[in-house]
Amino acid sequence: METWSPFDIYSHALRELFRDREESANVWEENESIMFPILDQYQKEAYWSLVKIANRFGGAFLCDGVGLGKTFVGLMLVERMGREKKHVVLFAPKGAKEGVWDPKLRELLPDLFGTDFSNLAVFSHTDLNREGEWPERFKRIAEIADVI
């Protein structure tokens, strides 16, 4: 006969109690995500592939051709990471940051792209070459970031 500690019994009871109440990522995507319904099927497949690769290898790159919706797949990933309370850092070319990413984040994911409190930081890739306080700032950001 196996002996269980009171903690083991308590944790098992809680796990059983909340087993059907815990929302999986797929349920969230289908029912609550802002971005998921906007994606075309091939973009959803790209998103799922990225998540699968990132979980397996600790990271992934989205390298699709022009016009295939990398921005929207990226927004979906940012939304999911925000839901998971991850600290996300996004680097984009300056023109894409100002002309695409900042406006799309404000439009589609305003709760994640806050100015006062946010787990999302967006930079131009040229910021990486800046001097002064920037190298130390990026060092701190790299220590805090869960996703870059």
Model-derived regions: residue spans:
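ATP-dependent helicase/translocase motor core
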Residues: 1-65, 72-81, 148
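SF2 helicase/translocase NTPase motor core
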Residues: 23-37, 41, 71-73, 82-148
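Short, charged/polar low-complexity linear motifs in solvent-exposed/disordered segments
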Residues: 65-66, 87
